[in-house]
C-alpha cells in the first residue's frame, strides 16, 4: 500500500460519511483493539497481522447531530475518535486509510471537492458504497481508471461490502478482488480490518451487486422472515418476548449448523419426519412460493443495487 505514513508509525483510519455503517465498523474495530490491549488479554490473532495497524481514527460527518451520535456510540471504547464536521478534505489529508461510507449519490461530490485528489494521493480508499464499482470512483477522481494506481502513486480504490452486524462483530464482508492484484501488505491490512467485525470472503468485482443484495440487504430479509415466525407463534398463544427469543435462537442455531458444514437441504430433511408437523409447515411455505419469492428478492435487490450506483432515481417504483 502506498502510504504517507512514515516507516514504523501508526496508521490513521478516516471514515467519510460516518453514518450507521461507519459507526458499526468503527465499533467493531475499537472493541477488538480494547480486547487486544486489555490486561491479561486472552485475545489471539489467528490471521496474519499486518506490520502496520490503524490505531488512530477520524470520523467525518456534516451535522452536529451526526457528531453527537458518533460520540455517544463510540464513548464506551478506550481509543479516542477525532470527529471532523463538513471538512472531508482535511480528514483525508490526515489519514493513511480512508473508508468511504456516504450515500452512493454523494460520492461524486465528495471526491470532486477541491483538494480531494491531492489529499488522497498514494493512499488506500476502501469504498463500501452499494452499487458503485471501483472504476466509477476512479472516474470521479481521475476521469479514467489508472492501469496500476499503486505504482503510479495514485489513490488505490478497493470495494468492500460489510453489513449492519458489524456493530456486534458478526458481519459478512465481501471484498472485491483487484486487477492488478493488491500487494500482500494492502490485502493483509484490508482483511484484518474487516476480520475485526466478522467473516470475510474475496470475490470478483463483477459479483459485488449480488453480494450487496445477499449480505447487505440479507439481514433485513431474514429479519422479516423471523418476524413472521414470531407473529405466528404469538397467534398460537406464545408470549411475544419469549417467542422472539425462541425464534431468534432457532434461526441462529440453524445458521450455526450450516456454517459447521451442514447442507441446508439435508438439515431440512433431518428435521422432517413422515406425517409430522415440520413437513406440514414446509408444505405451506412451498405452496406460498416462499422459496421463489426469497430468491426473487435477492435478484431484485441485486438489480436495484446496480442502478443506485449509477444515480438512477426511483428504481423500486419503476420495476414490476
UniProtKB/Swiss-Prot annotation:
A biological-process GO annotation: L-proline biosynthetic process
Signal peptide start-end: none
Molecular function per GO: pyrroline-5-carboxylate reductase activity
Keywords, alphabetical: Amino-acid biosynthesis, NADP, Oxidoreductase, Proline biosynthesis
SUPFAM superfamilies: 6-phosphogluconate dehydrogenase C-terminal domain-like, NAD(P)-binding Rossmann-fold domains
Top-level taxon of origin: Eukaryota
Pathway of action: Amino-acid biosynthesis; L-proline biosynthesis; L-proline from L-glutamate 5-semialdehyde: step 1/1
Keyword NADP: yes
Coiled coil ranges: none
Its EC number(s): 1.5.1.2
Pfam families with a match to the protein in the record: F420_oxidored, P5CR_dimer
Catalytic function, reaction form: L-proline + NADP(+) = (S)-1-pyrroline-5-carboxylate + NADPH + 2 H(+); L-proline + NAD(+) = (S)-1-pyrroline-5-carboxylate + NADH + 2 H(+)
Protein family (similarity comment): Belongs to the pyrroline-5-carboxylate reductase family.
Protein name: Pyrroline-5-carboxylate reductase
Organism: Lophium arboricola
Amino acid at each position: 500500500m502506498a502510504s504517507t505514513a512514515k516507516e514504523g508509525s501508526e496508521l490513521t483510519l478516516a471514515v467519510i460519511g460516518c453514518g450507521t455503517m461507519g459507526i458499526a465498523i468503527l465499533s467493531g474495530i475499537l472493541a477488538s483493539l480494547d480486547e487486544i490491549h486489555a490486561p491479561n488479554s486472552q485475545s489471539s490473532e489467528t490471521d496474519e497481522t499486518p506490520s502496520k495497524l490503524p490505531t488512530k481514527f477520524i470520523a467525518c460527518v456534516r451535522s452536529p447531530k451526526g457528531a453527537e451520535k458518533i460520540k455517544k456510540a463510540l464513548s464506551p471504547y478506550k481509543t479516542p475518535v477525532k470527529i471532523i464536521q463538513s471538512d472531508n478534505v482535511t480528514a483525508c489529508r490526515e489519514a493513511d486509510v480512508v473508508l468511504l461510507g456516504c450515500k452512493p449519490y454523494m460520492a461524486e461530490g465528495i471526491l470532486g471537492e477541491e483538494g480531494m485528489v491531492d489529499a488522497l494521493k498514494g493512499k488506500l480508499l476502501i469504498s463500501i458504497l452499494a452499487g458503485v464499482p471501483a472504476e466509477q470512483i476512479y472516474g470521479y477522481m481521475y476521469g479514467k481508471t489508472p492501469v496500476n494506481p499503486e505504482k503510479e502513486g495514485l489513490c488505490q480504490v478497493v470495494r468492500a461490502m460489510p453489513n449492519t452486524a458489524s456493530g456486534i462483530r458478526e458481519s459478512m464482508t465481501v471484498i472485491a478482488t483487484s486487477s492488478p492484484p493488491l500487494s500482500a501488505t494492502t490485502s493483509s491490512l484490508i482483511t484484518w480490518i474487516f476480520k475485526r467485525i466478522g467473516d470475510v470472503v474475496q470475490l470478483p468485482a463483477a459479483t459485488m451487486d449480488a453480494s450487496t443484495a445477499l449480505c447487505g440487504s440479507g439481514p433485513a430479509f431474514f429479519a422479516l422472515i423471523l418476524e413472521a415466525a414470531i407473529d405466528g407463534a404469538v397467534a398460537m398463544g406464545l408470549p411475544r418476548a419469549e417467542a422472539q427469543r425462541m425464534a431468534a435462537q432457532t434461526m441462529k442455531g440453524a445458521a450455526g449448523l450450516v456454517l459447521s458444514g451442514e447442507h441446508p437441504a439435508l438439515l431440512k430433511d433431518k428435521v422432517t419426519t413422515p406425517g409430522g408437523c415440520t413437513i406440514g409447515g414446509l408444505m405451506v411455505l412451498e405452496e406460498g412460493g416462499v422459496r421463489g419469492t426469497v430468491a426473487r428478492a435477492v435478484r431484485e435487490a441485486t438489480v436495484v443495487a446496480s442502478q443506485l450506483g449509477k444515480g438512477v432515481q426511483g428504481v423500486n417504483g419503476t420495476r414490476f
